Each structure stands twice: as structure tokens, then as C-alpha cells.
A protein has these predicted regions:
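Membrane-interface junctions of multi-pass transporters
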Residues: 217-218, 243-267
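Radical SAM/AdoMet-radical enzyme domain recognition
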Residues: 3-28, 35-159
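Short, acidic, Ser/Thr-enriched surface-loop or helix-capping motifs
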Residues: 230
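Radical SAM enzyme [4Fe-4S]-AdoMet core and its adjacent flexible, acidic
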Residues: 92, 96-108, 115, 119-226, ...
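Catalytic cores of large soluble enzymes that bind and process phosphate-bearing ligands
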Residues: 1, 34, 176
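Cysteine-centered iron-sulfur cluster-binding motifs in ferredoxin-type domains/subunits
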Residues: 31-34, 223
Length: 267
């Protein structure tokens, strides 16, 4: 993404935010550390918009960690409200799905950086995020592996993939996955009692009130509270739809033009 497109995206966000003061921007890939000079300039530009428009930007960085260094960590710890560190769990699981360009795994390269990053953030305002697939249905082992590495904020989520892909989750996998969630819950309770507790994103639910009415109506907020911006400035309901022409909403210069598509996400 160019600086010009990024600035226009922030201008679009401010112009369409109404009376909402807190605005969220996630630098998401691709890999934003490959274009980090633009990330830094966009953060500075966003800060310059806060006072005149009575806004507060909450920036998030999502990274695979390969290019992560001390300078990026220092900037992120100063400017990013949250960081998301991509790792799939055990070494063999992560390296199978996340090889580097030379075909080698990324686990040994990123784990020391991620552990340092988490400690620099005092084990808050971050999470390590993995994806489980048909190849690692025993995903609770990956969650516990990340906890054993010292991470306190963990999210491991099911892959979203076309059904023909060999790594896609299948209907026959569901009983095993449900067992894994039960297994994980029991182990988390045990560790909490032992003083070794950690947070698992999908278990962080308000058991007394549950989802609020607005959330039940709008779901994840795609197309209404959330938009994805491509490097060329095109707008989509979320990153899952990027590249699908039938879901293109418009662009950051002309705004949302396909209102009929956006309205589908309000139902």
C-alpha cells in the first residue's frame, strides 16, 4: 500500500465515522513489516487527525514476525494498542503451514522475538494467534504448547478454506474438535488453580449476559462496522472477501457505492 492510499483510507474513516470517537485500524497482511515506513507515516498522520476531528485512533499490528526487530517493537509498544503475533503452535505444525521463502520453517526464527515482544508488553495488549486445520485437529496441544512457551494471551482459530483444500475442516472433524475444546477447558481450569493460568480468546465470553442485542443483530460487523482496504484502495466487507468482485463495495476515494451489498450485511 502506498502512503497516498493509506492516508485516503484514514480520511475516509474519519469522514464516515459520525459521532463515534474511537476508531480502530489494523495493519494486516500480507505482511505490514515489509512496508513499515508507510505504517509509521500513517500512524503519524492518524495522530494528526485526532485533535481537529475529536477522534482517538487505536492501531493494531498483525505480523508473522519474520522481519520483526527491536525498532519495530519499540514503535509498536509506543503506538499500537494491540499486536497480533501469528504462530500456529507446535514447531512441526507451524512450519508445515508457515514456511519461509527458502522452504525452511519459521518457528525457530519467530519464537524468541515473540516471547520478547510479549514480555515488553507486560503480557497484555497482545495475543499470539494461530490457525488450526484438518492436519492438526488436536489443536488443544498447540494452545498448550504456546502457553508452555510463556504466552498469556492466546487465540487459535479454525481455518476458513474452500472444502476441496486438503487442509480444510470437514464435517466429520467436528466431534474431534468438540472434544478438543472440552479438553482445553479442563486443562485451563487445572492450570488456573495451579497459578499457571492464561487467556484463550474464544473462551472469553460474558457468561452472565452473553452477546448484547446489537451484536446479535449485526454479527461480526462486516460491511457495517468494519471494512477491509486493499493496497489499491478498494473496499470490501472484510478481508475474507478481498478479491471477490461481487463483494467489492467501492473505494476510499468515492466511498461505498454498492450500497445494496452493504445492506445485505445489516440483515
Amino acid at each position: 500500500m502506498s502512503l497516498e492510499v493509506g492516508k485516503q483510507a484514514l480520511d475516509f474513516l474519519v469522514a464516515n465515522s459520525g459521532n463515534r470517537r474511537n476508531l480502530e485500524v489494523d495493519f494486516f497482511g500480507g505482511e505490514p513489516t515489509m512496508n513499515f515506513d508507510v505504517v509509521k507515516e500513517l500512524v503519524r498522520y492518524g495522530r494528526s487527525l485526532e485533535g481537529p476531528h475529536n477522534k482517538n485512533f487505536r492501531f493494531t499490528l498483525t505480523t508473522n514476525g519474520v522481519l520483526l526487530d527491536d525498532d519495530i517493537m519499540e514503535f509498536a509498544n509506543r503506538e499500537m494498542a494491540n499486536v497480533v503475533l501469528s504462530i500456529d503452535g507446535r514447531k512441526e505444525v507451524n512450519d508445515y503451514m508457515r514456511p519461509t521463502r527458502n522452504g525452511k520453517g519459521s518457528y525457530d526464527l519467530i519464537v524468541p522475538k515473540f516471547r520478547k515482544f510479549a514480555e515488553l508488553r507486560n503480557q497484555t495488549n497482545y495475543y499470539v494467534r494461530g490457525t488450526f486445520t484438518h492436519h492438526n485437529l488436536d489443536f488443544s496441544e498447540d494452545v498448550l504448547h504456546l502457553a508452555d512457551l510463556g504466552f498469556k494471551q492466546i487465540s487459535v482459530e479454525p481455518v476458513v478454506a474452500p472444502p476441496e483444500e486438503p487442509y480444510a475442516i470437514r464435517e466429520e472433524d467436528l466431534p474431534k474438535l468438540l472434544e478438543e475444546y472440552d479438553k482445553l477447558a479442563k486443562e485451563m481450569i487445572k492450570r488456573e488453580k495451579e497459578g499457571r493460568g492464561f487467556n484463550f480468546f474464544h473462551f472469553m465470553i460474558d457468561l452472565t449476559q452473553g452477546p448484547c442485542v446489537a451484536k446479535r443483530l449485526s454479527g461480526c460487523g462486516s460491511g457495517t462496522e468494519y471494512l477491509a482496504v486493499t493496497p489499491w484502495g478498494d473496499l470490501y466487507p472484510c478481508h475474507q472477501f478481498v478479491g471477490m468482485d461481487e463483494f467489492k463495495l467501492g473505494d476510499v476515494w468515492h466511498g461505498v457505492q454498492a450500497e445494496e451489498i452493504r445492506d445485505e450485511f445489516k440483515l
